[in-house]
A protein has these predicted regions:
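Extended acidic/polar, glycine-enriched regions
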Residues: 1-11, 17
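Aromatic-lined carbohydrate-binding/catalytic grooves of carbohydrate-active enzymes
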Residues: 23-179, 185, 189
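Conserved beta-strand positions
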Residues: 68, 192-194, 240
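Flexible loop residues that form catalytic
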Residues: 71, 195, 243-246
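A short acidic (Asp/Glu
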Residues: 77-79, 202, 249-252
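Glycan-recognition surfaces
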Residues: 127, 132-172, 176, 216-289
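N-terminal/domain-start segments enriched in small and hydrophobic, helix-friendly residues
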Residues: 177-220
């Protein structure tokens, strides 16, 4: 039964490029290793990233993909004011201090050694007071106290909106914004995170007598957004990490790749193998990052 289900998923619910199922690439990152006060990629600079690419080339260890994760955008490196990668989402412009020419110089170096360039985004979670929240308040879903918060967000610095992908105008705007960003910065693969509990935002904004309609329209918008990117960039891979494994339903993996199947993967190799065993019964393709 498991083999039959896996064949079904492979045939009908796996993103294909050129008619063939996507093969997940061997990837590496530019991570500093998070020395204090850095977190994720908030201490990364253009020079450091390019030096990392050259280092991999020096030892003939060039991967298929170089991966830039969270913390490349405005305000994410402002540790003096308690800012970090997580509480500055919604500021989707490149930090010009650390990356004065944008991300294109890094992309060019990655392409020089024959690799692809993948960059992390989390466009759905929008911090209150961020650029998107201030510029487009009409597209922000507010949970109005109904959202469930995870422990790591209960510090008073992670109060956010949910970008309303269920609004067609908002969805079209975001699709073009992200698409233009990928093109201008030479990005080959798009990595989308989702560190938020959406149910409270949806239920707080349902129309009277139409319970669940906000969620339905939102998910339709999400799929439309991914399809826009995939149609605009043939060969694009959408890595849907979503806090690790939160979007491995059949419709999501039909359009994207769970290349980071769980955030539990930080430094626990026995856990990796347990996940490999369990998920292999159902999903023919998934990754640890």
């Amino acid at each position: 039964g498991h083999n039959q289900f896996r064949r079904f998923v492979q045939a009908h619910h796996t993103w294909k490029v050129g008619g063939k199922p996507t093969v997940y690439p061997i990837s590496t990152s530019f991570n500093y290793g998070d020395p204090t006060p850095c977190n994720e990629y908030t201490c990364l600079t253009t020079d450091y990233a390019i030096a990392m690419v050259k280092r991999y080339e020096q030892f003939k260890l060039v991967p298929e993909v170089f991966w830039l994760d969270a913390g490349w955008y405005n305000h994410s490196a402002d540790v003096a004011n308690h800012k970090n990668w997580a509480n500055t989402v919604g500021n989707w412009t490149v930090d010009s201090i650390r990356f004065p020419e944008g991300l294109r110089p890094i992309a060019d170096e990655v392409h020089r050694v024959g690799s692809k360039f993948m960059v992390w985004f989390e466009p759905e979670r929008v911090m209150k007071g961020s650029a998107w929240a201030l510029q487009h308040p009409q597209w922000m879903l507010d949970a109005r106290g109904k959202a469930k918060q995870e422990d790591w967000t209960k510090d008073g610095e992670h109060d956010s909106y949910l970008f309303n992908l269920g609004n067609p105008e908002a969805c079209r705007w975001m699709s073009k914004y992200i698409g233009d960003f990928l093109e201008e910065n030479g990005i080959d693969y798009y990595r989308q995170d989702f560190n938020i509990e959406p149910e409270g935002f949806w239920s707080a904004n349902d129309e009277p007598g139409r319970q669940g309609i906000c969620e339905i329209r939102y998910i339709e918008g999400l799929y439309s957004f991914w399809e826009y990117l995939l149609n605009r960039f043939p060969g694009l891979l959408v890595d849907n990490c979503a806090s690790g494994g939160r979007r491995i339903d059949l419709e999501s993996i039909s359009r994207s790749a769970p290349m980071w199947r769980t955030d539990y993967s930080y430094g626990e190799p026995i856990g990796y193998q347990c996940h490999t065993y369990g998920l292999n019964l159902y999903l023919p393709l998934h990754g640890t990052g």
